[in-house]
């Protein structure tokens, strides 16, 4: 499958201006560069950002798996037992479809190249048949691409169902092509950029834009300075060219003078050459005598070398015997170490089994503890509800008692007022009767009063009963 690789052009670097001294006035403004802004947060907090990052991570994981399918097809014999028959079958079908697509594309390229070469035969029937066959082949490409998409989804579905196979496939990362690896690196770089973008708050984004604007202004000022420096450099270059022309003129004059000097010095050169030849002959005779002496020294050194070799051979034999003895001791120590390590391995396995059993018991105890905690929370909630109900009942009882006392007080006041009114009425009636009957009926009046008192007592008893 073809991968589109996006290349990023390198940043522009301005001309390097060296060896130029500037004399500028010091300004009162601070020239400290603004500090680069970094996000204050290090983790994603919202669900949407986490979902975005999880989707991008899953996409990168799927791309890593898809770019290794061609390597799996080429090494199918070594991976067939590890990945499973279903996955290998799906991979073979996917590779066959990709190969078919590549064959169609190559065929179309060849036919189009043939059409370009034979543009002068457009009116011929065979040319039209060729164009029709090319269009027919192009119409077959979209269904084939759709089949490749479906097969890719099927292979990814099988690999995601089997995490062990996916991890085993990711180990084969050396089989990935350079284009695919660069594409994955671009996706990882995009993930880092998106992660930093999601961590940046609106306030930080505003600060970042302000930071970029400051950098832009500084860059503009620096560009103006660079332009002025380039103008100064051009002026300096012109001055230097003028000086170079002057120096070239001086050099030419010196060359002419030197040529004249060489003509005059040829005779002196011949004389010095003859003297040098004489000196060379004398040195040659002296060197021959020196060579003979050196050869005698070489013979002496060779005899000494032979004697040293014999001595070193005897020492080498003794060292070899010592080495053999040390090697046997090392082998014995290695065997002893292997026995001790096997015993410790058995002991470690037993302790591992005991650790696993205790871990299972700990899990059971944790489950029981969680159940007891839930029951305790339920009981605590029920107690709180009952306490609230009891408090409400007590408050209701207090309200009822207060209402009863108030009703009793009102009823007592009503009875007292009614008794007082009845007494006043009876007294008024007695006075009227005394005036009519006269003084002779005082005894009857006394009896009437006694009867009135008896009635009042009866009413008092009835009032008490009502209370």
From Swiss-Prot:
Basic residues biased stretches: 458-467
CC per GO annotation: ciliary basal body; cytoplasm; motile cilium
Xref: InterPro entries: DRC10, IQ_motif_EF-hand-BS
Transmembrane portions of the chain: none
Keyword Metal-binding carried by entry: no
Sequence ranges assigned to domain IQ in this UniProt record: 400-429
Primary location class: cytoplasm
Region annotated Disordered, chain positions: 422-467
Keyword terms: Cell projection, Cilium, Coiled coil, Cytoplasm, Cytoskeleton, Flagellum
Positions in coiled-coil regions: 334-382
Localization (cell): Cytoplasm, Cytoskeleton, Flagellum axoneme
Biological role stated in the UniProt entry: Component of the nexin-dynein regulatory complex (N-DRC), a key regulator of ciliary/flagellar motility which maintains the alignment and integrity of the distal axoneme and regulates microtubule sliding in motile axonemes.
Annotated family: Belongs to the DRC10 family.
Subunit structure of this chain's protein: Component of the nexin-dynein regulatory complex (N-DRC). Interacts with CFAP52.
Protein name per its UniProtKB record: Dynein regulatory complex protein 10
Gene name in the database record: IQCD
